[in-house]
Regions:
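Transmembrane alpha-helices and adjacent helix-loop boundaries
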Residues: 1-285
Length: 285
């Protein structure tokens, strides 16, 4: 029992240390990139950061840096979540905890982000987002807080990348393409820029819609001898793109806007109570 507990603690610590190191490395590169890039604003800032991301991806695939980055080869020598699976005496897996461990670490990161957003630094970030001129007039150091926001968000992005690599049990630079970046940005836009719970909801909806609910559209379907037109490989993404465009057009601020789920629930309860009180008042009147 003692050796088992010691092994479990060692395994957990190795994963935690790897996640923290991944976040710190991402934060360090963000600090280096942020020195010249954060002088830009709006679309120029987005284009510059995307450009640097592609440059870094190309550098990490450079074969001459193979001894350091493993080049374009697949990297597997790091802790993975499969170690958390519970096995029987015969060696067969009886409980796949590797599926749930990423959710635990994700919830921990979300809790830390919520604490940050509700802190004095988080309020400063919101003030800069809403109006930089007004924020500077209030005495907020724009350069300092922009850099802090950039580095902090990159830290959590690094942790997310490490979670992804540990879940699939391998890492390769070519996997992290600009397409993945656009998907993440799209999830944020759908959920609502400035809403943590909105991003969480949009993540589940995005994955469920693109990978599960519309999967049947990729399969050729026959009704008797008649072949249903359009239903073929790739049609799923066409329909999914149309759904995304409709959502963006009709929900300009995303599903949640800048609100959080508790605020939406509280507002819904208040409206329900107001309608109930109004009905009771009209009935008594």
């Amino acid at each position: 029992g003692t050796s088992g507990a010691g092994g479990a603690v060692s395994m957990i610590l190795s994963v935690v240390v790897a996640l923290i190191l991944a976040g710190c490395v991402a934060a360090f590169f963000a600090w280096l990139i942020g020195l010249p890039v954060l002088r830009l604003k709006s679309d120029y800032l987005a284009i510059a950061t995307l450009g640097f991301a592609e440059i870094l991806r190309a550098i990490f695939q450079w074969q001459k840096l193979g001894p350091v980055t493993n080049g374009a080869n697949m990297l597997k020598s790091f802790p993975t979540f499969t170690s958390f699976n519970i096995k029987s005496a015969s060696g067969s897996t009886v409980l796949y905890l590797s599926t749930f461990v990423p959710f635990f670490f994700s919830m921990l990161c979300i809790a830390l982000i919520v604490l940050l957003v509700n802190s004095t630094y988080g309020r400063a970030f919101k003030a800069i987002r809403d109006d930089e001129v007004a924020a500077e007039a209030m005495g907020i150091n724009l350069a300092k807080h922009k850099m802090l926001s950039f580095v902090t968000s990159s830290f959590f992005a690094g942790v997310g990348g490490a979670l992804f690599a540990m879940y699939v049990a391998n890492a390769q630079a070519k996997v992290f393409t600009s397409t993945m970046t656009y998907e993440i940005l799209l999830i944020v836009v759908i959920g609502g820029i400035g809403s943590i719970s909105g991003s969480i909801i949009a993540t589940f909806l995005y994955v469920a819609c693109s990978e599960w609910w519309l999967r049947f559209l990729d399969a050729e379907t026959y009704i008797g001898a008649f072949k249903v037109p359009l239903l073929r490989n790739g049609f799923r993404m066409v329909v999914f793109s149309i759904v995304i465009m409709i959502v963006v057009l009709f929900f300009r601020q995303g599903i949640m806007g800048s609100r959080e789920l508790p605020e939406v629930i509280a507002g819904w309860k208040a409206k329900r109570k107001a309608r109930k009180d109004s009905k009771e008042a009209s009935a008594n009147g």
